[in-house]
Amino acid sequence: PGPCCKDKCECAEGGCKTGCKCTSCRCAPCEKCTSGCKCPSKDECAKTCSKPCSCCXX
């Protein structure tokens, strides 16, 4: 794994932190998902969202 990515990915808005390489970076749980992000609940968003760190609104 690349830098910053051992147990969990360190995220920044829109993707991984600068210099970090990871394939499993996901956004944190949120109130609701933005359109185009498929998830049944806010808790599932971080697990199933395909747009790292930018799928959640609010």
UniProtKB/Swiss-Prot annotation:
Cross-referenced InterPro entries: Metalthion_crustacean, Metalthion_dom_sf
Family to which the UniProt record says this protein belongs: Belongs to the metallothionein superfamily. Type 3 family.
Sequence positions that bind a divalent metal cation 5: 33, 37, 55-56
Protein name: Metallothionein-1
Keyword Disulfide bond part of the UniProt annotation: no
Species the sequence originates in: Homarus americanus
Positions of a divalent metal cation 1 binding: 4-5, 16, 20
Region (Beta): 1-28
Positions with a binding annotation for a divalent metal cation 3: 11, 16, 25, 27
